[in-house]
Regions:
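Active-site glycine-centered loops adjacent to acidic/histidine catalytic or metal-binding residues
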Residues: 64, 103-104, 138-139, 247, ...
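N-terminal active-site segment of His-dependent metallophosphoesterases
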Residues: 9-113
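Residue-level marker for buried hydrophobic side chains located in beta-strands
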Residues: 59-61, 99-101, 135, 244, ...
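A short C-terminal boundary segment appended to hydrolase-like catalytic domains
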Residues: 16, 21-24, 28-34, 39-44, ...
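Extracytoplasmic/periplasmic, Sec-exported soluble proteins
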Residues: 72, 76-79, 83, 114, ...
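Extended active-site neighborhood of metal-dependent phosphoesterases/phosphodiesterases
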Residues: 39-47, 110-229, 265-276, 301, ...
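Short active-site segment of divalent metal-dependent hydrolases/proteases
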Residues: 67, 106-107, 141, 250, ...
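His/acidic metal-ligating clusters that form di-metal
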Residues: 86-98, 194-196, 208-325
Length: 389
């Protein structure tokens, strides 16, 4: 109680601040805990490194850190910030190709100047690390949870706040490719491997009387322009092993869209690519989420999309739909078993502060020689699972 009281008192900000100076000053005092960085390094050295070769692509992956300006010892809070600091610190001395975050950096429930401060500090940590990085947008990252809880009638984040604090820095790196300045699809290459990043929070920022038409926290989707860009990238993907990452799951086990808009269409693109088809793809919608596009995947050689990897659900699960593995990773954010919103998966882990179950993270090794995608978990995560590519 004392810790929480001091934290709430500390994070009091002036309304005029774009980023809370007090938040920024406090966050800069956070340091990686040696026990955790050593633990992450040991997991890599023992389990991952024996599988690393010159042709592999090796990723350090976190998702759903839900950073929040409270020093909670049992739920979302500053622990999410620490997990990123510690994972990136460990990877500075490891043969990792990229540091990846699958979205929901923040919980989105703090005052906007505090949430912006959390985003800025976290991205500076990624920028100062020794590895290139990519951070995807999650459905909490536009701070709509704060708007909902405070019943305010105006959007707490402006149109370009998230882009300027996060996405812009993704694309400042030469390793991260995109088709055009406005494209929401990114990709990285290494040898015969191509990794594509999709934005499952591709929601138009439209204000009605100062309030958002769409609540980014509740609405997930992919719009026509992003689908067109994905098609363009795939049409030029020749003889590659392709793995796709996003924040939210695209489809259910039954094949129905798990997004509010167009998750099933993206799955159809994947299967059409694997089948080397050409044709037209459209839905029954008009307006913001209407889609009517053409594609031609007949000249892509032996390229195949094998796996789609995401977070969002705060548990682990994998299922195969039409030959493509859909893999859901657990949240890094601490979820103590006594909290009502804690998922059953995390309750079983009985996650505790200052124990290895506090965090959850992954190393993903894509090996074209063995034709395997191997996932090595640590903390509250499955230790090993592998899939064909």
């Amino acid at each position: 109680m004392k810790i929480k009281f001091l934290t709430k008192k500390f994070f009091r900000a002036r309304l005029s601040e774009f980023i809370s100076v007090q938040t920024d000053n406090f966050l800069r005092k956070l340091k990686p805990r040696p026990f955790f960085t050593e633990y992450i390094e040991q997991v890599f050295r023992k389990n991952v490194e024996p599988n690393v070769s010159q042709n592999c692509l090796t990723l350090s992956v976190l998702t759903d850190t839900h950073e929040k300006a409270v020093a909670s010892s049992s739920y979302y809070g500053l622990n999410g910030v620490r997990h990123i600091i510690e994972a990136n610190k460990a990877c500075d001395s490891l043969p990792v190709d990229y540091n990846i975050h699958l979205g929901d950096l923040i919980d989105g429930s703090d005052k906007p100047e505090i949430s912006r401060g959390l985003l800025q500090f976290t991205m500076e940590n990624y920028q100062n690390s020794q590895r290139p990085f990519y951070v995807l947008e999650g459905n909490h990252d536009e701070n709509d949870k704060y708007d909902e809880h405070k019943f305010i009638t105006s959007a707490s984040f402006r149109r370009d706040d998230y882009y300027n604090l996060v996405t812009k820095h993704d694309f400042e790196q030469p390793e991260i490719k995109r088709l055009s300045l406005g494209s929401k699809v990114a990709w990285i290459d290494k040898g015969d491997i191509r990794v594509i990043f999709l934005n499952t929070s591709d929601i138009p920022y439209i204000l009605n009387g100062g309030a958002k038409k769409y609540d980014f926290k509740k609405v997930r989707g992919i719009r026509e322009q992003q689908i067109e860009d994905l098609i363009s990238i795939l049409e030029k993907t020749i003889d590659k092993h392709v793995v796709v990452f996003g924040h939210a799951n695209l489809i259910s086990q039954s094949g129905r869209s798990a997004l509010d808009f167009n998750g099933d269409l993206v799955q159809k693109i994947f299967t059409s690519f694997n089948n080397k088809d050409s044709g037209q793809l459209k839905n029954e919608l008009s307006g913001d989420f209407g889609v009517n596009v053409r594609y031609n995947f007949t000249d892509t050689g032996i390229s195949t999309i094998s796996n789609y990897i995401c977070g969002h659900m705060h548990y682990e699960k994998c299922y195969k739909v039409n030959g493509i593995n859909h893999i859901i990773l657990n949240c890094s954010a601490l979820m103590g078993k006594k909290h009502g919103l804690t998922t059953d998966y995390n309750k079983k882990w009985d996650r505790r502060y200052n124990e290895i179950s506090e965090l959850a993270g992954y190393f993903i090794n894509i090996n074209p020689d063995k034709m395997l995608l191997q996932i090595f978990g640590y903390g509250a995560a499955t230790r090993f699972v592998s899939f064909e590519i």
